[in-house]
């Protein structure tokens, strides 16, 4: 995703929201948002260090801290304890819980919306574009997330690197739209 989202430039989120996911309750601290990519960390973000297919997020903690991360979320690592100068929040099954964590962190933005999913082999971009245009014509606020990017109110705001964005990007985008 290529964007400066609202959560990264002005809002603050309490880490204690993540207590139900963590092995121990995080200290009372605040972060501006969640980020999976250490290269995209902005000061005040929490770095979510997930083990991927090719790379392990734990290897990028130092880079995230150097870029201004104010907390790290990661799987418990009992055989290889991690020491950081910032809060380190251990969350079992982090990758599997990421959607629920992001939804909780951003105050469940989809609860304030009607969500429609469009699937299939062909025609998804056209179909979602038509739905968005219809909503606009009928004066209903709408947004589309897809191949071309995310469009709140049919106005391109963010470019996407993937057709289906990660859970954090989806939840933070929905939170931005909720707060428009």
Q: Which functions belong to the PLM regions below?
A:
Residues 1-100:
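N-terminal leader/targeting and accessory segments in enzymes
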Residues 7-9, 19, 97-180:
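Phosphate-binding loop of NTP-binding sites
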């Amino acid at each position: 995703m290529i964007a400066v989202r609202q959560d990264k430039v002005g809002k603050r989120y309490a880490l204690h929201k993540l207590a139900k996911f963590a092995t121990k309750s995080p200290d009372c601290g605040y972060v501006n948002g969640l980020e999976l990519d250490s290269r995209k960390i902005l000061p005040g973000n929490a770095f979510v260090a997930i083990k991927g297919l090719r790379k392990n997020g734990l290897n990028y903690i130092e880079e995230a801290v150097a870029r201004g991360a104010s907390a790290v979320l990661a799987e418990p690592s009992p055989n290889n304890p991690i020491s950081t100068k910032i809060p380190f929040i251990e969350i079992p099954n982090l990758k599997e819980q990421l959607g629920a964590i992001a939804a909780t962190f951003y105050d469940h933005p989809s609860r304030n919306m009607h969500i429609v999913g469009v699937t299939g082999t062909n025609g998804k971009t056209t179909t979602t574009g038509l739905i968005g245009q219809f909503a606009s014509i009928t004066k209903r606020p709408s947004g589309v997330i897809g191949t071309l990017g995310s469009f709140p109110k049919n106005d391109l705001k963010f470019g996407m690197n993937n057709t289906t964005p990660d859970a954090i990007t989806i939840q933070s985008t929905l939170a931005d739209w909720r707060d428009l």
